[in-house]
Amino acid sequence: MFINHKHKFIFIHIPKNAGTSIRNSFDIQGYDKRVVRKPYPHNSCSEIKTYCGDLTWETFYKFAVVRNPYDRIVSYYHFHKSPQYRFPALANKYTFSDWLKRGMEDNIKRTQSDYLDIKINQIGKFETLQKDFDLFCNLINIPSYTLPKYNVSKHEHWETYYSDEDKKIVYGIFQEDFDRFGFAI
């Protein structure tokens, strides 16, 4: 998450949803921000509210980005295969299907809905990121700009990774996200 006191907004950074691009874009544009990494860089709304206090939470504009869970999990899979991950050799020994069944860590199974456990002002979608970011900038009265891309994994469209069984596994874990955010099954 990060908090910008000058423009009075809070960004809830959900993993694998372009959060690094959004956070770094504010650095590039010179916007003051305070990055909060307690207890970890990806906090739920209730954790952020506890950290920043009721007054800040109630008066600041709050936004987040969600992503189709099928696509998000493919992104996680490729991240785990990259040198950035602490155990890439472990992830590289699994096919996508095997990784879903045996290699996916519990923290990956945390739903996006869990991060957004308190109502916020705006939920954008990864699939329409620039359009939603432009709206956010307009609402907080700052000029919009093209978001840079960071940590982009190169892979085929998510649909090519999934068997019917794989889709059932992911849907079973993330059903709340599919329902709440209107993603197709």
Where are these regions (language model features)?
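Membrane-interface amphipathic segments in extracytoplasmic regions
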Residues: 1-185
